[in-house]
Structure formats: structure tokens, C-alpha cells
Amino acid sequence: MNPLRIRNFLLLSVWATACLTGFLLLWNYSFTPGETEEAPLKIPSHFQDGRFHLLMSIHPRCPCTKASLAELHRILAKTKGKMGVSILVYMPRGEQREWQNGALLNEAKSIPAVSIISDQDGKIAESLGMSTSGAVCLYDKDGNLRYSGGITASRGHEGDNHGKSIILSQVLGKTTGMEKGIVYGCPIQNNPTDS
């Protein structure tokens, strides 16, 4: 056999293996859900306003959050004021000034009729069972939990997904009951992007 052919075959094999390995690592990362905790069955009273209310927790340095905010925009366009929204923005204690600006935080602030709440050290999110950026809890008009989970199909990917469908169905009166979903995103606390 020709040594040049053997070398080319080996190079092609190494290249193909590297490409496949990279693809599998990316696939695994994209579809590995974040941690979830049990959300309270009743909304904290200071969030209740007589209509559906969605609470979302975000880490302003998590790149996955951009897709969650885009999906929130889509949900709000279809629910047309039938739901209040509060976004809990993780802020580490003593570093608020450095964290006050940023593309994701500015994007969250640009969403009309959404309340932005600075969540120092993620304590509010933690009390609501939200430990992953992009986690949401939907509560009905009576303050009962109707959905907890995420609103993206994988990390950082926009498009149709189970969580968004459930929220739309609940708010638009097509279904009732409580459902849970998967959250894809970065951890709210102890996030490697914090440093």
C-alpha cells in the first residue's frame, strides 16, 4: 500500500474523529438540563396582581439567557397583557455597579410591561426553587402554580418548545392543571462566568 495513502487515510480518520467528538460534546452540553427545585405551590403575595403572573430568574452573564428572553418576547406578544411578568436578575452582593449594565440585562429591561427585580445573591430565585438561568414559574389568577420549568428546547436555542406551549395554553384558557418542564441554562449561583 502507498505510504501517502496511508498517511492521508490516518489524517482523515483523526479529523473525522475530532469532528464527531466535538459534535457529540456540543450536543451533550446543549441538551443537559440545569438543576431544578420544587417551586412553591402558591405565589408570594407581593407578586399576585389578580391575573396570571410569570416569574423568570436570569443570570445576566449566561449566554443561554438570550434565547429565554426571546421566547418570553414571543409569549408576551401572544398573551397580550393577560399575564404579569417579573424578571429576577441575579446580582452578587457588593458588585451591583459592575453588573448594572450588560447586553442581557439591557435586553430584559427593554421588554415592555415587565418588572425587573435585582435579586441579590439569587436569594429570591432560591426561595422559588429557581437555580438555573431561564427558569420560570407561572401562577394563575388565584396564585396557584401552573407551570415550573424552562421556555427553550435546549441551551441557547429559540423555537417551539414544550414550556412555551404550556404557558400559552394556560394563559389563553385552553388547559388547567400543573405541569413541570426542563430548564436549560447556566446555574444562577456559583456560575463560572461570575469571575
Where would I find each of the regions flagged by the language model?
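Short, Lys/Arg-rich N-terminal segment immediately upstream of the first membrane anchor
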Residues: 1-6
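Hydrophobic membrane-insertion alpha-helices, especially the h-region
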Residues: 8-27
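Alpha-helical transmembrane signal-anchor/signal-peptide segments
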Residues: 30-43
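Short active-site neighborhood of thiol/selenol oxidoreductases, capturing the structured segment around
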Residues: 46-72, 82, 86, 167
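Short, thiol/selenol-centered motifs that function as redox-active sites or metal-ligating centers
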Residues: 59-69, 93-97, 184-195
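Structural microenvironment flanking redox-active thiols in thiol-disulfide oxidoreductases
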Residues: 66-108, 123-127
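Short, internal strand/loop/helix patches
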Residues: 104-139, 145-146
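Thiol-/selenol-based redox modules, centered on thioredoxin-like
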Residues: 146, 150-195
